């Protein structure tokens, strides 16, 4: 806990288990780990496996190259890197994932989570699925406008710069950070509780 999976570990698991879909968290909230994703998409393509990424804590704040890294499906939220109120879950899937979805032999048992229905709702069929939260659409538009005005790479750099200042400050106080710098999230910092501090008492307080 507190370490990223290596490329070799992921490659071995995909090649031996042969999953239909490989899912991984890009930015792990509980541990503060940033998982490298480059190269995983190639392994998935070679093994006829879809590549799904949980980008809840990374979208908008960290480099996330959906097409370049050959990510087939990804989802996130509105309230973290996009700086909006909670309530929306941005989602993307490519043609490869759509083809897999449309070739299902069994019906999705859950109506609300049936992506084929969502596809028809957002696509040209316009089949009703749910009432969209219009106020949230305005909110996410504003969040995206602010990111676009600053520049996406500038946002990434700002998070990195501020994180390093925080890390240096914590270490100057004698605190030990939980994750090695190579795999440390710039958007979420985890700190080890010093031996002299009662961890349970601190959390309860």
Where are these regions (language model features)?
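Active-site C-terminal subdomain of aminotransferase-like
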Residues: 79-168, 172
């Amino acid at each position: 806990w507190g370490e990223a999976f290596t490329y070799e570990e992921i490659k071995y698991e995909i090649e031996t288990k042969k999953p239909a879909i490989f899912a991984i968290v890009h930015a792990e909230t509980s541990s503060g780990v940033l998982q490298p994703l480059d190269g995983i998409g190639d392994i998935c393509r070679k093994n006829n496996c879809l590549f799904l990424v949980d980008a809840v804590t990374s979208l908008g704040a960290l480099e996330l190259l959906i097409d370049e890294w050959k990510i087939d499906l990804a989802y996130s939220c509105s309230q973290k890197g996009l700086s909006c109120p909670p309530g929306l879950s941005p989602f993307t899937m490519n043609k490869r994932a759509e083809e897999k979805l449309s070739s299902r032999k069994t019906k999705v048992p859950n109506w609300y989570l049936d992506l084929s229905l969502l596809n028809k709702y957002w696509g040209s069929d316009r089949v009703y699925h749910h009432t969209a939260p219009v106020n949230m659409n305005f909110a996410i538009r504003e969040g995206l406008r602010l990111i676009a005005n600053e520049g996406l790479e500038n946002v990434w750099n700002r998070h990195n710069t501020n994180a390093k200042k925080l890390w240096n400050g914590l270490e100057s106080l004698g605190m030990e950070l939980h994750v090695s710098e190579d795999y440390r999230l710039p958007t979420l910092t985890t700190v080890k509780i010093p031996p002299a501090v009662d961890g349970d008492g601190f959390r309860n307080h």
